[in-house]
Amino acid sequence: MKKVAIFASGTGSNFEKIADDERLKDKISIELLVCDKKNAAVIKKAHDRNIKVFIFSAKDFESKEAYESVIFEKVKDLDYIFLAGYMRIISPYFLEKYKKTILNLHPSLLPKFKGKDAIEQAFNAGEKEIGISIHYVNEELDGGEVIAQRSFEVAGNDTIETVTEKVHKLEHKLYPEVILKLVEEALLKEH
């Protein structure tokens, strides 16, 4: 059993899919949700599942390093961190301290459309194929090694709303699958 933290900032739909995935139940224990928005819907989803929550507001700290130091103390003994709609950039300071695996889910086919509003950027650019990437987190924004990608062809009648919905469906399916594979491989190596 691997102990993990999930970092999220919004509704928590990916958090929910990971937490409720039956294949992961005996492989991971979600020890903590880290959230930077006190009114985020993901908080209730964590509470409903009896998962501890750490909520912080960046403005309550003198620096990014200050709040990341507090977060590090809470996650330092955990095996993995999974970013699921976490809207803050993990700093080199944190990456230097936390030497274990951090995964991120990004709603574009990296290396295209890094950063915020990736779905909208891809749609407005007239991309014929849109998708998602799951990658290791490193010091470069959305620049770590890509582990998995999935995509779909944009239909002529697609809108930004329908494309966003299709992206979320891909996320909800692929992220738990990638986590399962990663954890199963790690557990096999231990035996």
Label each PLM-derived region with a short phrase:
Residues 70-98:
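A glycine-rich beta-strand to alpha-helix segment
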Residues 26-70:
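Short, surface-exposed acidic-centric catalytic microdomains
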Residues 13, 40-41, 62, 88-89, ...:
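Short alpha-helical
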Residues 16-20, 69-76, 173-176, 180:
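Amphipathic, non-transmembrane alpha-helical secondary structure
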Residues 21, 28, 87-190:
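Donor/substrate-binding cores of folate-linked one-carbon enzymes
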Residues 1-41, 45:
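N-terminal Rossmann-like dinucleotide-binding module
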